[in-house]
Swiss-Prot record:
This is Translationally-controlled tumor protein homolog. PROSITE patterns: TCTP_1, TCTP_2, TCTP_3. It comes from Drosophila pseudoobscura pseudoobscura. It holds the Pfam family TCTP. The keyword Oxidoreductase does not apply. Involved in calcium binding and microtubule stabilization.
């Protein structure tokens, strides 16, 4: 199994246990599911409640959300009220990623510069439909993952977007 971590903060962002698609060699799209879980138990949304154990009536801690967000302790970030503030963040973040890339993988710099401009325009065009998540450290200097709900086969599926060059892979 591979864990993908933010190269700036070291936060765990996602693992290769989910369906992943690489877009334009710069953005990983990770397809999540809506889940609810009590304690360590995980239940998928829409499961047949009558086929499950009866509720004892005790107070339990139930958390619901996107599996990738819950499993990797991502935290919703409300720092970007408008496109301009997100664009400023992106420009600053891209400079940091370029510096790391030039140091570790100079052959990827041109790919990153060329394809990232296209990806940024596409993302900014859908800005109002996005949610933003940081890693567990809540450090906005690092990667801010994007979540968008897409209609796939008649279902609303959460798709998380991560910038490939802002991640490092760690084998477990």
């Amino acid at each position: 199994m591979k864990i993908f971590k933010d190269i700036i903060t070291g936060d765990e962002m996602f693992a290769d246990t989910y369906k992943i698609k690489l877009v334009d060699d710069v953005v990983y799209e990770v397809y999540g599911k809506l889940i609810s879980r009590e304690g360590s138990e995980i239940k998928l949304e829409g499961a047949n409640a009558s086929a499950e154990e009866a509720d004892e009536g005790t107070d339990t801690n139930v958390e619901s959300g996107v599996d990738v967000v819950l499993n990797h302790r991502l935290v919703e970030c409300f720092a970007f009220g408008d496109k301009k503030s997100y664009t400023l963040y992106l420009k600053d973040y891209m400079k940091k990623v370029l510096a790391k890339l030039a140091e570790k993988s100079p052959d990827q710099v041109d790919v990153f510069k060329t394809n990232m401009n296209k990806a940024m325009k596409d993302i900014l065009g859908r800005f109002k439909e996005l949610q933003f998540f940081t890693g567990e450290s809540m450090d906005c200097d690092g990667m801010v993952a994007l979540v968008e709900y897409r209609e796939i086969d008649g279902q609303s599926i959460p798709v998380l977007m991560f910038f490939k060059h802002g991640l490092e892979e760690e084998k477990c």
